[in-house]
Amino acid sequence: MALVVGAAGSALTFFGAGFFTGTLLNTPESELCLKVLALAVFVMAVMGVLRGFFQGMGTMMPTAISQIIEQIVNAIVSIAAASYLFSYGVKLDAAAGITNGKSGAIYGAAGSTLGTSLGAAAGLLFLIIVMLMYNRVLQKNMRRDHVSRQESYASTLRVLIMTIVPVILSTAVYNISGIVDQGVFKYLMLDVQKADKSTVEIYWGIYVGKYKLLTNVPIAVASALSASTIPALTRARISGDWDEMRKKTEGAIRMVMMICIPSAFGLTALGEPILDLLSWNTNEIAPKLFLIGSASVIFYGLSTLTNGILQGIDRMQIPVRNAVIALVTHLLLMISLVQLGKLHIYGVVLAYMFFAILMCILNGAAIRKHLDYHQEIKRTFLIPGVSSLIMALAVWLLYQSLHKVIGVRISTLLCLILAVIIYAFFVLLLHGITEEELRSFPKGRTIVRMLKKIHLI
């Protein structure tokens, strides 16, 4: 099934690249990038099945190692291929007598995209090797498994489809929202408002390449926690343990908020210094996007997790329905802000944030209804919020005092380190995390002993 779906998706991506980039997204220069990325669609489809198999067997090790291999190969190939193909593109322009041509940028971007495809292929190769090594054990376990009834492939496929399709649709709506936003934004700016094309491209490049890239880092942690929450909730649901389901839900939400709330405050306070640290602060718009939209980290983290919770309690269709409602509503808001309010890329950020807020509201209502769940407020939201506010004010004042003396990069790194320390100190001081929860962390017992010595717990 994964082979068929992956091959179909890969073919659609490759042969439809011109239509997607030129007609839908109004960025014909990215056609080559999308064609190079087509291989990754097939590879990821197969790799997802193998990762899911090992996770279902109760081990995350093959998945974790394959992800490390994938990212290492991705980084190496992206840098090398981008450099080589950029030079190749420049030579093509020179040979054609074109000055200030786009071939260098087009081929360089395609080289960078090649890293994604080959990184995924390297991760898949590792998983295939592990699967071949494990096959002997699997065959032995299958021979020992005496069952009274053998399920047919048709019934198994039917269950898989009924489980997979709602998850895919929910994820697809999330991803489609970005594509739709791009198409609508460029249509409004270029065709309706007749804005300068290079300016519009700069706006969108800052939004995707800087704002969304940095805000997606803590959101990715929420996605990982969401994926790990689903099996535990499913086991509790099958055993009929509603108290355990509510306990797992509360713990997962608290953990995500412990990460996402300080991340949002940190990006608000240090967004511009972080951009300077990465040498990305080349336009005054970028820092403003973080001032306006860093709160999206909180709402996207929570909405991603609540999607997983609803899937874990076998309410697969609800996240899909909620995502469609949020997509349509946020699109109407974005059109109003960009076209009527003339807010250009700021309108996109506000609508992007509204999408996640609405998802949180709709998913939260569904969880309350189907799980009889009542959210704890103090330790989940108030204490992380107060601790994050103190941390953000402290590091902002510190940065303002230091950056003219010791330089932007050193002062930013120092503030980032101190931000973690200050936040952790106040969370512990305000009893935002219990000793039992600390003990569940890696090296948790050592951490508890150390904190007891300084009387923080």
Which residue stretches match the model-derived regions?
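Membrane-proximal transmembrane or re-entrant/amphipathic helices at the cytosolic face
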Residues: 397-457
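Interfacial segments at transmembrane-helix termini and the short loops linking adjacent helices
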Residues: 18-36, 250, 267-297
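Alpha-helical transmembrane segments of polytopic membrane transporters and translocases
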Residues: 195, 199-222, 253-255
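Membrane-interface junctions at transmembrane-helix termini in multi-pass inner-membrane proteins
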Residues: 45-67, 295-325
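Membrane-interface helix-loop junctions in multi-pass transport and translocation proteins
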Residues: 61, 72-125, 130, 317, ...
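Interfacial transmembrane-helix starts/ends
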Residues: 1-4, 12, 157, 161, ...
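Interhelical loop/hinge segments that connect adjacent transmembrane helices in multipass membrane
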Residues: 91-110, 128-171, 240-243, 369-384
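Helix-loop junctions and terminal segments of transmembrane helices
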Residues: 219-239
